[in-house]
């Protein structure tokens, strides 16, 4: 099976074009639940692939509005690459999306979800038990944690989720980057540079050097509601045990439109199975 058999073709892709703004990207991420959007530019009448902008980029750079500065380069692949080789590249580079290119032209995107869908359909190997693939380290937060704090925890942990625990340390839900982006909004304002010069009134300062007025610079921030995480999390949890196969779990992920499921041993949280973990079993 090759990348061409699993990828999303260019005709079905949502892209943003340079020049453009962060609001264009945020709109698509919120509307479609994507993790990133390809960036293209028209050069001499031809569409040229430039890079990707992800939801992490928007949150990490709240004051940047230019797509050319927000976007980043990521590994690419070709349509005739094997799905196994592409999956290995996704895992090694921790890239959720591989742009599929033909020269400078974008011909499609291969996502983690595309590969998971192939596993679910039995088109590639999916017989390994997920207990051997799961990540045992779990990022967690509390139901009463303010959303901005929970979002920061997710960012610091370097994972796209936090399992939400109640007062008894039992699973109450899960908060994902998708949940955060859905309620994020861009707020514009101004910040003053101040109207005085440091030490302007000291005895040794040069005479005549005084501040003549404040300057105001435009600012742009991503703002999140300050309510507790329980108001924004997903509370209908799908869990799996370690004896389930990668194919079984892939089918659960596709059916429920999620990127990860908690791994349980009885009723105890034992790990997390992320969609990208399943690619390691191919």
Regions from the PLM with identified roles:
Residues 1-282:
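Tandem CBS (Cystathionine beta-synthase) repeat/Bateman regulatory domains
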